[in-house]
Amino acid sequence: MRLSFVVPAYNEEAYLPACLQSILSQTAAYPGQTEIIVVNNASTDRTRELALSFPGVTVVDEPRKGLTFARQAGFAASSGELIANVDADSRLTPGWLTQVLDTFMHHDLASFSGPVIFYDLTPRQSVLVHIFYLTAWITYVINRYILRVGSMVQGGNFVVSRAALEKIGGFNTAISFYGEDTDIARRLNDVGEVHFTFGLKMFTSARRLKNEGMVTMAVRYTINYFWTTFFKRPFTDTYVDIREAQIVEPQPEG
């Protein structure tokens, strides 16, 4: 079973190296079974140059700015039976790849996803994020099993089968940012099993949360989740790119 990593990247020279290192540290155990595709999404910094400096990494250029354009370009360039979508400011947690491959080997899934763990928050902030995730989980259960109107996918930490993604026509490029993962979860749920588990974690940067504020970000994501679920389009059409140079190393979970 071949797996393709797709990493969209717009001006990610500060974070991309750590992301790729985390992927390569796990793919080494599966020679010939994986590929890594970085989608250079109209970057003006050294993103493309840095990506090419890593052995075995393929760079695809997508001049149309936007997350879904980048995800779709990566999907089109990939060859794997599974497509792993990882954000450029994220890093795989230990055992991530093994868990994904084992899960798809033993279960017929359209998609497999889990939460992101912010590695650069204070303990108090981390507790608040966990409370938000608990609320999101309850919402997911109600929507999927009671209202039957959708499912849940974490956009920067999900793996999808090529067959399922082809059935739904790929990513919805009409959605630029907010709601893109809710949209694809809803559509994938129509063609197969969309499984979300807190057991599949991904380290990621809290740069957007720090820039926008926890309350603002939580409200914005919640509104767009419901809007996309029930009206099939996001409430918020615009977004701001958050980029920074400071790097914080992820800490293992205690």
PLM features: residue spans?
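Short, flexible, basic/aromatic active-site loop/helix in glycosyltransferases
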Residues: G114-D120, V129-S151
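Short aromatic/hydrophobic "clamp" motif used to bind/position activated sugar donors
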Residues: I83
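Conserved donor NDP-sugar-binding/catalytic core segment of glycosyltransferases
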Residues: G95-S126
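Acidic donor-binding loop at a coil-to-helix junction in glycosyltransferase catalytic cores
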Residues: F177-I184
